[in-house]
A protein has these predicted regions:
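Noncatalytic alpha-helical scaffold of FAD-dependent oxidoreductases
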Residues: 1-250
Length: 250
């Protein structure tokens, strides 16, 4: 579908597919196309600053009620997409992230992860992803699939060819044992991505082992060499540098 209908279409502006948990066998593909038709939504931008009570209720219900995920897949989303919509491009790009913010993060929180796999490995990666998330009973709200073109120049490029990005948005408890459990299945997902020639997004929680880090980013040693040359005293640092670079200094 993506190759035939979206990838080379000059009118495709935004594209996204959502894999529905907990089975991950069905997806809803949405493509916004360039058109000269009259807009169905006159606003050019979302205003922001609203209470978002309804949006937050649905996020809670999807993750906490017995039929929440089923309702989203078979009732809520079909209603949201049953009418053809014509929006300004900036309107679709200006949603307020606050509508996803929970009322409290004391006992639970929502977290993002992202994995990148070659486009041609989609069918190989998805069953691996599904098996891991199901086995660990990950309370996934959404797995969004997006496309990225190759980035041949960057040393730490995550899109080394035509790439699908799998953006996992999930809910987890804040207890220490819950955090430790997340680290375990995250490392399994990293292995799954690497096994098909992919990698994972670095800026999120540094659960990857040093071996996984270098398997996912085989040119990291080139970056480390630049770091040693430009910052020999290791003054500029963060968690990533401390975990994957600092051990090589001794």
């Amino acid at each position: 579908h993506f190759r035939d209908k979206v990838r080379h279409s000059p009118d495709a502006i935004f594209h996204n597919a959502d894999l529905y948990p907990p089975q991950y066998v069905r997806a809803r593909s949405v493509t916004w196309m360039r058109t000269d038709d009259a807009v169905t939504e006159p606003r050019r931008l979302h205003q922001g600053g609203a209470g978002y009570a309804l949006e937050r209720y649905f996020v809670w219900a999807i993750t906490e009620t017995p039929l929440g995920k089923w309702r989203r897949e078979y009732l809520i989303d079909p209603l949201l997409y049953w009418r053809r919509k014509v929006h300004w491009r900036n309107f679709e790009a200006s949603y307020d992230a606050a509508e996803l913010e929970p009322a409290s993060r004391t006992r639970s929180t929502y977290v993002l992860q992202e994995y990148f796999v070659p486009v041609e490995k989609f069918d190989e990666f998805v069953p691996k992803l599904a098996e891991i998330l199901q086995r660990f009973r990950v309370n996934a709200l959404n797995v969004s699939v997006r496309h990225a073109q190759a980035d041949p120049g960057a040393v730490m490029a995550w899109a080394r060819g035509d790439t699908f990005a799998f953006v996992l948005y999930y809910k987890q408890r804040t207890r220490d044992n819950a955090k430790n459990r997340v680290a375990v299945w995250t490392r399994e997902l990293i292995d799954a991505a690497v096994s098909v020639g992919g990698c994972y997004y670095l800026p999120y929680q540094p659960h990857a082992t040093p071996e996984q880090f270098h398997a996912a980013y085989p040119r990291a040693k080139e970056l480390f060499a630049i770091k040693r040359r430009l910052d020999p005293a290791f003054r500029f640092r963060n968690v990533l540098w401390d975990k994957y670079y600092a051990p090589n200094l001794s």
